[in-house]
């Protein structure tokens, strides 16, 4: 995630893009994540907007995200993301909401290799909470990861993460581009051990 969801990524693009994403880390059709977004590159400040939805009618998490990024030089990029999240469930009529900020850095030491650092949900503010003691949103997360393009159509991605619940979590995945603009993704994470599959189009 430190590379894939890093707000500094918007500073990598030179063309306007619209992208569609779907992934499912639980292998259950009701627990997939569907997203759409676009990126508007600009030499002064690039901008990206994303909307994603996780779950089904009885339980749904919705995320609206605005990302801004700046290229500092040939190797360094920085970015900030602002999120608005809400949770809807049949268990309660209340709709918890949260505002949060992500801070990201990207470093390109050599061609075809990206190294990223991401601080998620720092800070975060609960706009509306459950009156019960149900935890609705995750806390802060610090992630370091990489993205390596082995060949033109194959990427390897890895991430190490630390958060309030886990000292560290590992993620590893691949992305294959069978034809232009279409991506197939597969990966696995630890704590708990979960595989994931996904597709993307842009």
Q: Which residues are covered by each model-predicted region?
A:
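Subset of outer-membrane beta-barrel
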Residues: 1-202
């Amino acid at each position: 995630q430190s590379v894939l969801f890093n707000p500094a990524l918007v500073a990598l693009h030179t063309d306007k893009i619209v992208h569609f994403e779907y992934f499912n880390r639980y292998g259950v059709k009701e627990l997939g994540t569907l997203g759409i977004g676009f990126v508007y590159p600009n030499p002064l400040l690039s901008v990206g907007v994303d909307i994603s939805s996780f779950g089904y009618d009885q339980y749904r998490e919705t995320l609206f995200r605005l990302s801004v990024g700046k290229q500092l030089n040939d190797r360094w990029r920085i970015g900030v993301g602002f999120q608005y999240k809400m949770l809807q469930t049949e268990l309660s009529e209340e709709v918890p909401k949260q505002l949060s900020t992500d801070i990201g850095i990207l470093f390109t030491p050599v061609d075809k290799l990206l190294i990223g650092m991401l601080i998620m949900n720092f800070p975060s503010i609960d706009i509306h909470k459950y009156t019960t003691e149900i935890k609705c949103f995750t806390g802060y997360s610090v992630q370091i990861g990489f993205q390596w393009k082995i060949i033109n159509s194959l990427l390897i991605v890895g991430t190490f993460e630390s958060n309030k619940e886990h000292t560290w979590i590992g993620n590893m995945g691949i992305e294959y581009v069978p034809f232009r603009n279409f991506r197939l993704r597969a990966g696995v994470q630890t704590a708990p051990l979960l595989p994931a599959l996904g597709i993307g189009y842009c």
